[in-house]
Amino acid sequence: MSSGKIAQVVGPVVDVVFASGDKLPEINNALIVYKDGDKKQKIVLEVALELGDGMVRTIAMESTDGLTRGLEVLDTGRAISVPVGKETLGRVFNVLGETIDLEAPFADDVNREPIHKKAPAFDELSTSSEILETGIKVIDLLAPYLKGGKVGLFGGAGVGKTVLIQELIHNIAQEHGGISVFTGVGERTREGNDLYWEMKESGVIEKTAMVFGQMNEPPGARMRVALTGLTIAEYFRDVEGQDVLLFIDNIFRFTQAGSEVSALLGRMPSAVGYQPTLATEMGQLQERITSTKKGSVTSIQAIYVPADDYTDPAPATAFAHLDSTTNLERKLTQMGIYPAVDPLASSSRALSPEIVGEEHYAVATEVQRVLQRYRELQDIIAILGMDELSEEEKTLVGRARRIQFFLSQNFNVAEQFTGLPGSYVPVAETVRGFKEILEGKHDHLPEDAFRAVGPIEDVIEKAKKMGF
């Protein structure tokens, strides 16, 4: 184990010099430094660059407070390795695989895997066309998720990405019954804490591994924690042959952390100040999130859109890797429609008659056509009013508004805030409900009866209570 000394500390970036003749650590190797020589105060560094003359530049996985020039640094000879396998289920840990749930740490002999790996080869990949039912009407109807696919939840600040991801965990993890891995990347610690206790109460935690590198942690931890979660998911897929659900909240913070350290590593900033290696870093992460012939990884990723600008390089780079996109729209939150999923901007390659069936496809495309026509008519309505529309257009507008409200739904995870019980709607019920609205069977019911309900029977029941 070769050793060097700290030459310079600039925030999360630490330069380490090794004596001439000593073997230099490889890129991505983990180095260990003890604060003040205290074996309990260990800081892990990861080699990012080799500068020449025995000098390497590293990124710290923990705060560099207390580090001084001249402290001894040891090369472990391998990349950061984290615990994998059944021992990780029901546990919460950090980027280094250290437990943070106040329970006993992992045993020394626990199976460990390095967080840096190559993506599976082409001939190992599997192509599945099986739909993953979420129980959320707007998603199942218009932008269905594929089992073993990659899903992005796009939205600006405060439009409901985390609530939607928590509802998906509630619905899919309980229905799916398989193994889930939740990775919190640079998000609020409070949300992670709430999610942990919620999962503990529902019993889902027994089949879930949780990894966190939250907002208050150094960029090194936020940059690598997604790889830690992915490594655990890969083990369950490749070694145990399981179908795994991988939740990542939030992929943008992974990019943001890379951007924070990029300039300190001496790289020239690229578009909008992002790192020049943005596409490469995103590709290395996303290409590993895939399904092989041994098992599948279905990933659901929340992606923050800065200032609601979808042309920003961070969300734009993520777009290219996804099978389905669920776009959350601020205007819908202002109308009180939750989940605020934009039915026209959201898309999925699974929405084809070969995968979802002829009836589902026909209903979904007709719903989109009606909503698109309504959007076109809104300018006329705003300027001239409803009276200037033809009878046919008035009928279409009425149905479009009912469809728009019927796309909203109460969530189980939001019950404590709304006081209304959540609902899980099977795909067949969803398709039937929208088909009946399109056929005009419920034109006589008030629009408000369609707001925040489950299946179409709930609408009829709600309308009766309103006196219709």
Curated annotation (Swiss-Prot):
Annotated binding of ATP, by residue: G155, G156, A157, G158, V159, G160, K161, T162
Catalytic activity, reaction form: ATP + H2O + 4 H(+)(in) = ADP + phosphate + 5 H(+)(out)
EC numbers on record: 7.1.2.2
Main enzyme class: translocase
InterPro entries: AAA+_ATPase, ATP-synt_VA_C, ATP_synth_F1_bsu, ATPase_a/bsu_AS, ATPase_alpha/beta_chains, ATPase_F1/V1/A1_a/bsu_N, ATPase_F1/V1/A1_a/bsu_N_sf, ATPase_F1/V1/A1_a/bsu_nucl-bd
Xref: PROSITE patterns: ATPASE_ALPHA_BETA
UniProt-annotated location(s): Cell membrane
Keyword annotations from UniProtKB, A to Z: ATP synthesis, ATP-binding, Cell membrane, CF(1), Hydrogen ion transport, Ion transport, Membrane, Nucleotide-binding, Translocase, Transport
Keyword Translocase: yes
The UniProt record lists the keyword Zinc-finger: no
MF-aspect GO terms: ATP binding; ATP hydrolysis activity; proton-transporting ATP synthase activity, rotational mechanism
Assigned GO CC terms: plasma membrane; proton-transporting ATP synthase complex
Main location (coarse class): membrane
Tree of life domain: Bacteria
Entries under CDD domains matching the protein: ATP-synt_F1_beta_C, ATP-synt_F1_beta_N, F1-ATPase_beta_CD
Topological category with respect to the lipid bilayer: Peripheral membrane protein
SMART domains: AAA
Similarity section: Belongs to the ATPase alpha/beta chains family.
PANTHER family according to UniProt: ATP SYNTHASE, ATP SYNTHASE SUBUNIT BETA, MITOCHONDRIAL
Subunit and partners: F-type ATPases have 2 components, CF(1) - the catalytic core - and CF(0) - the membrane proton channel. CF(1) has five subunits: alpha(3), beta(3), gamma(1), delta(1), epsilon(1). CF(0) has three main subunits: a(1), b(2) and c(9-12). The alpha and beta chains form an alternating ring which encloses part of the gamma chain. CF(1) is attached to CF(0) by a central stalk formed by the gamma and epsilon chains, while a peripheral stalk is formed by the delta and b chains.
Function statement: Produces ATP from ADP in the presence of a proton gradient across the membrane. The catalytic sites are hosted primarily by the beta subunits.
Name of the protein: ATP synthase subunit beta
Classification of source organism: Bacteria, Bacillati, Bacillota, Bacilli, Lactobacillales
